[in-house]
């Protein structure tokens, strides 16, 4: 019985020795993949295998849309009225996602102008139902907003075309009076002035052009309106958060509207005369093109 017990113990010790040696061989074989991590003075031993998944390459091109807003107003002897507001916009954008096998990532953001202008056009209808097309060839000529104001004046008795202009790099305000306004001796005059030029005429064509950084200060509103009930010797009224003064002299009602940088005074001397003014705002925003290549 003692012999069997001793033999069993020897067998157990030999088995344990073989197991320990095999384990040591395995650890020795895996020494190349072993990383030692220390924390609080304790050494931990791990066999670590790492793999990195690279993110996908994303290329996005966006062309910002250009919006043209046309607001028209009519100034007459007895009323100030707004007409329909027209907004035209167009946008083009594209995006693509492709996988990448590399783990390195390079990202850059560039600001540039769009290579192709969105085709946006609008028209201004005057009292004689003739349309003048707003030029759009320089929508994206510069990064800043371009403001081009069109002022056309006419009498209901005439049918001549009155509004034409083109968008410049710098904002240009042009005032136009019809070439013929009631040729039967009517007195229709206009004066426009700014910091650089001014002109006025009576019963003839009048034009004033000056480069400015802001739009013409015409009463612009799409929902509010105001009326002048009577033309007293001296009165005023408010429209679109602006104050307008009215004066009467020799039976003629005069309406004045102005601001700090630009003002235009139109003299309405006949009951049938009116002034159509349209302000066109062309806002071109910078195109942001983000390219992430992996």
Curated annotation (Swiss-Prot):
It comes from the Eukaryota. It is found in: Secreted, Cell wall; Membrane. This is Protein DSE2. Residues 85-246 are annotated as: Disordered. The keyword Acyltransferase does not apply. Disulfide bonds: none annotated. A lipid is attached at residue 276 (GPI-anchor amidated aspartate). It comes from Candida glabrata (strain ATCC 2001 / BCRC 20586 / JCM 3761 / NBRC 0622 / NRRL Y-65 / CBS 138). InterPro entries: DSE2. Involved in pseudohyphal growth, cell wall metabolism and required for the separation of the mother and daughter cells. Residues 85-126, 144-236 have a biased composition (Low complexity). Residues 1-22 form the signal peptide. Keywords: Cell wall, Cell wall biogenesis/degradation, Glycoprotein, GPI-anchor, Lipoprotein, Membrane, Secreted, Signal. Residues 277-294 form a propeptide. The keyword Lipoprotein applies. The gene is DSE2. GO terms for biological process: cell wall organization; pseudohyphal growth; septum digestion after cytokinesis. Belongs to the DSE2 family. It is a lipid-anchor; GPI-anchor. GO terms for cellular component: cellular bud scar; extracellular region; side of membrane.
